[in-house]
Amino acid sequence: MTDTTRSLRDCLAPAKLNLFLHITGRRPDGYHALQSVFQLLDWGDRLHFTLRDDGKVSRVTDVPGVPEESDLVVRAASLLKAHAGATLGVDIEIDKRLPMGAGLGGGSSDAATTLLALNRLWRLDLPRTTLQSLAVKLGADVPFFVFGKNAFAEGIGEALQAVELPARWFLVVTPRVHVPTAAIFSEKSLTRDSKPITITDFLAQRGIDAGWPDSFGRNDMQPVVTSKYAEVAKVVEWFYNLTPARMTGSGASVFAAFKSKADAEAAQAKLPAGWNSAVAESMSEHPLFAFAS
C-alpha cells in the first residue's frame, strides 16, 4: 500500500470465510439470528483512493452489473462524508479480484476498506466503534471487516468478539453460478433452529466435527444451496474424496484448509480443468486496522 497526503493506493479489501455458520432463529425485525466465526484471507479486491477538493464522491472504474450510485463503496464514502461533515471528496478505483455473489464478502469488504481508508485520508480520526455503527447501515458483513480481527459473530453478524486462529492456507473453489442470499434465507427447508453456542464451546470443540483444525459445526445454508445448485454440489462432492470442505456464507464458494501453501497448491493442481479457484493465506488482522482507534 502507498500512503501519501493526497492518495492511498493498493488498499487490500480482504476476503472472508465463514468457518461455520449456524442459524439460531429469526428476529422480530425479520432478520435471521446467526452465529459464525469469520476468518480473514490475504486475498481480495484492491482499492485506490485519490482526494478531490470539490467534495464529490466518484467511482472512476466500471464494475459490471453494479451501478455507481448503488455501489457499496460509493454509499460508504457518502455515508461517512455526511456523518463527519467532511468537505473533501474522493475518486475511488476498484480492482475487482474476488468473484461476486460467492460468499466471500467482496462488496462488504470494499465498503469497510473505504470507511477505514477515508477515515485516514480525510483526517477524520473517528473511533472504530463509530465506523462500525456506520457499517451496520451498509450490510451485515461490513461491521466485521471494520472490526478488523478474526471474530466470533452473533446477531446478524454485528456482535463481534475477537478470536485467535492459527495460521493456515486455504483452497477456495468458486463455481460459476451466482447464489442469491435473500432467496436462500427465504427457503422453507432452511434450518433456523440451531442450538446457540458460546465462544467457549467453539474454542473447546473445534476440530472435532469436520476433521480439520478449527473446524466446528456446519454451514446451515449448505444443504439448501447444494440441493438447488448442482454446480456447488459438484464442488462439495469433489472435495469429499480429498479433504473435508465447507461452503462459506450463502455460497457459492467452497473451501478447504491446509497446513501449508504447498499442500493447498497440490490440491489445487488436482482440480478439474476450468474450475475457478484460488489459494490464499489466513490473516489475523485487517491491513488497514491501524486506520481507526
From Swiss-Prot:
<dbReference type="GO" id="GO:0050515">
    <property type="term" value="F:4-(cytidine 5'-diphospho)-2-C-methyl-D-erythritol kinase activity"/>
</dbReference>
<keyword id="KW-0414">Isoprene biosynthesis</keyword>
<feature type="binding site">
    <location>
        <begin position="99"/>
        <end position="109"/>
    </location>
    <ligand>
        <name>ATP</name>
    </ligand>
</feature>
<dbReference type="InterPro" id="IPR014721">
    <property type="entry name" value="Ribsml_uS5_D2-typ_fold_subgr"/>
</dbReference>
<dbReference type="GO" id="GO:0019288">
    <property type="term" value="P:isopentenyl diphosphate biosynthetic process, methylerythritol 4-phosphate pathway"/>
</dbReference>
<dbReference type="InterPro" id="IPR020568">
    <property type="entry name" value="Ribosomal_Su5_D2-typ_SF"/>
</dbReference>
<dbReference type="Pfam" id="PF00288">
    <property type="entry name" value="GHMP_kinases_N"/>
</dbReference>
<comment type="pathway">
    <text>Isoprenoid biosynthesis; isopentenyl diphosphate biosynthesis via DXP pathway; isopentenyl diphosphate from 1-deoxy-D-xylulose 5-phosphate: step 3/6.</text>
</comment>
<feature type="active site">
    <location>
        <position position="16"/>
    </location>
</feature>
<dbReference type="Pfam" id="PF08544">
    <property type="entry name" value="GHMP_kinases_C"/>
</dbReference>
<keyword id="KW-0547">Nucleotide-binding</keyword>
<feature type="active site">
    <location>
        <position position="141"/>
    </location>
</feature>
<dbReference type="InterPro" id="IPR036554">
    <property type="entry name" value="GHMP_kinase_C_sf"/>
</dbReference>
<dbReference type="GO" id="GO:0005524">
    <property type="term" value="F:ATP binding"/>
</dbReference>
<keyword id="KW-0808">Transferase</keyword>
<keyword id="KW-0067">ATP-binding</keyword>
<keyword id="KW-0418">Kinase</keyword>
<comment type="function">
    <text>Catalyzes the phosphorylation of the position 2 hydroxy group of 4-diphosphocytidyl-2C-methyl-D-erythritol.</text>
</comment>
<dbReference type="GO" id="GO:0016114">
    <property type="term" value="P:terpenoid biosynthetic process"/>
</dbReference>
<dbReference type="InterPro" id="IPR013750">
    <property type="entry name" value="GHMP_kinase_C_dom"/>
</dbReference>
<dbReference type="InterPro" id="IPR006204">
    <property type="entry name" value="GHMP_kinase_N_dom"/>
</dbReference>
<comment type="similarity">
    <text>Belongs to the GHMP kinase family. IspE subfamily.</text>
</comment>
<dbReference type="InterPro" id="IPR004424">
    <property type="entry name" value="IspE"/>
</dbReference>
<protein>
    <recommendedName>
        <fullName>4-diphosphocytidyl-2-C-methyl-D-erythritol kinase</fullName>
        <ecNumber>2.7.1.148</ecNumber>
    </recommendedName>
</protein>
